[in-house]
Amino acid sequence: EAARLLGSAPIDVLCFGGTSASFLHGTSYDVALTKKLTGWAPGPKITTASTATLAALAAVKAGTVALATPYVDGVHARAIRFLEENGHKVVSSRNLGIDTDQALAEVPLEKIYDMVREIDTPEASAVFISCTNFKSVGAIEALETAIGKPVVSAIQASFWHSLKIAGVKGAKPGYGSLFAGMEAHAPGGSS
């Protein structure tokens, strides 16, 4: 119902923001979900958090990944399966075992930072932080500086992909290497 209502609104992009809800049943489910949303809301371009994640990992040329999630074991295992069925070997991972949405949103940024530092390995070409309710964006630039590789989060990827498919430039620095080249510049070349 929400997709139908939004489909008639003057919007350019509709992003289904549930990361685990879009990957839980695999890639074919994510594709079917996108088609269903397109049918319900034929006006805007459609993406999902999982589709956006795959596009973001491709953009940063991630092959092998280290995975950080707040999920319980079963959902974490499905996140690994989703990434691997889409060509991203998971070489290291950790999950927090959280099972409520409110608790997901209450994880301190420092804990997410420490978690990523723990799972990073030389074999990983990038780190992926799953869950759009896992507030990780504020740590991305510091993590990339510390570990020297791209860090992609589900919420960051969703925002980036929504801007990309809408053809929008204008991201401000601070969202990680995924946004390189998307900054808007004032006439004359200054920011």
Kindly label every feature range from the protein language model.
Residues 1-190:
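Non-catalytic structural scaffold of enzyme domains
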